Amino acid sequence: MVSIRNFHEQDARQLQQLKYQYKSIEEIKEIINLWNEKAYNGSYYEMFAVCDQDEIVGSVSLYKHSDYIISAGPEIYMPYRKKGYGYEALMLAYDYAKDLGYKIASAQIRTDNVASMRLHEKLGFQRDCEMINRKGKSVYIYLKQL
């Protein structure tokens, strides 16, 4: 069964194997502690472990854009991709955001990222517009009412 939860310092070794091979356990624990502060640049931000049973298969973050708009960013680690974890992680993250009072989910997806577009459409998102992001890349904005 897939679930999301906050990261714990005990997750550092598993994160080192899956994502942060070139960081020490202490550096990874510092990253986890920063995530658990639930803020980034003065806005609400929360990072969750995506778990299948007790095994971490990825992460998903929530980022506040306004009092009513939030976005989520999933990262499923390489050995676990293409198994439906991204869909489950986003469903759980957006359910959590709805419980917190958010009304709209927003996603910025590169125009060449067909897999992400399909995933968001499967989740009920609709394409709203196209724009150039801060990195100079063409992206679509997808929106969904929570």
Model-derived regions, located:
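A short beta-loop-alpha structural element at the N-terminal edge
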Residues: 1-15
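Alpha-helical elements of Rossmann-like donor-binding domains used by nucleotide-donor carbohydrate transfer enzymes
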Residues: 14-17, 30, 34, 88, ...
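Acetyl-CoA-dependent GNAT
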Residues: 6, 10, 21-73, 77-79, ...
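Conserved catalytic-core motifs of GNAT/GCN5-like acyltransferases
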Residues: 108-109, 124-141
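Conserved acetyl-CoA-binding loop-helix of GNAT-fold acetyltransferases
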Residues: 82-96, 118-122
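Active-site acidic-Proline motif in GNAT/NAT acetyltransferases
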Residues: 77-79, 83, 111-112
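Conserved GNAT acetyl-CoA-binding A-motif
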Residues: 99-109
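A conserved beta-turn-beta hairpin within the catalytic core of GNAT-like acetyltransferases
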Residues: 64-74, 81, 101-103, 133-138
